Amino acid sequence: MTAIAPVITVDGPSGAGKGTLCKALAESLNWRLLDSGAIYRVLALAALHHQVDISTEEALVPLAAHLDVRFVSQNGQLQVILEGEDVSNEIRTETVGNTASQAAAFPRVREALLRRQRAFREAPGLIADGRDMGTIVFPDAPVKIFLDASSQERAHRRMLQLQERGFNVNFERLLAEIQERDNRDRNRSVAPLVPAADALVLDSTSMSIEQVIEQALAYAQRILALPLKK
C-alpha cells in the first residue's frame, strides 16, 4: 500500500509571514509548495486566456478541475507557473483580481478547486499555505502551524513593503483594513480563520523571520524526522 505523502499546513491572517515561511520550508525540505491564495487568481487568468465566460459556473468548473498550475520556490522567490508559463506578476493585476472574486462565488468552482488543491499532495511532501489548509483542505496533515501576529505589527510590515515599492501609505488606514478583514475572516460561517485544534500556534509579533523559520522547522522535524535538503 502506497504511503500518503505528508503535508505541513501553514495558516494564518494576512501579513503574519506565511508566504516567507512556506517558501523557506519548501526549500529546506525540498517539498512541493501550494499557495492556495493564488489558486483563484490563476483560475481567473486561465479563464481570460481561454476566453471562458467567467459569469457561467458551468464553463468554469471543468477549467478549475484541470487547472495546470504549479508553484516553484527558488532563492526565496515564488514562481507561479500556469500551463508552463511564469504568471507570477500577471495574476496580481486588478483585472485578474476582480475576475477571481467572481469565480470564487460559485460553489461548484470552489469544490473543484478544493479537489485540485488536494491533488498537490505528492511525494516527498507538500507545504500548504493558506487560511483553511489545516482545518478544511488537509485536516489529516501531520504538521499544522498557525502563524499569527498582532494587527498593528502586520499593518507596520505591510506599510514598509508598500513604502519600499514607492507608495505613500497611511498606517491608520492600513490597520483599519487589516482589522476589518480579520473580523470578516474569523467570523465567517464557512471555513472561518481559526487554528486547527492540533496546530502549533506561533505569534510572530516579536520574532524575526529567522526565528519563525527555525521554530517551525524544528517542530516539523520533531514530528516527521525527515532530513533537511543538503
From Swiss-Prot:
Catalytic activity from the UniProt record: CMP + ATP = CDP + ADP; dCMP + ATP = dCDP + ADP
Record's subcellular location: Cytoplasm
An annotated Gene Ontology molecular function: dCMP kinase activity
EC number: 2.7.4.25
Cellular compartments per GO CC: cytosol
Gene3D superfamilies: P-loop containing nucleotide triphosphate hydrolases
Enzyme class: transferase
Keywords, sorted A to Z: ATP-binding, Cytoplasm, Kinase, Nucleotide-binding, Transferase
BP term (GO), one: nucleobase-containing small molecule interconversion
InterPro entries: Cytidylate_kin (IPR003136), Cytidylate_kinase_dom (IPR011994), P-loop_NTPase (IPR027417)
Major location (coarse): cytoplasm
Pfam families: Cytidylate_kin
Domain of life: Bacteria
Residues engaged in binding ATP: 12-20
HAMAP family associated with the record: Cytidyl_kinase_type1
Family listed: Belongs to the cytidylate kinase family. Type 1 subfamily.
Name used for this protein in its record: Cytidylate kinase
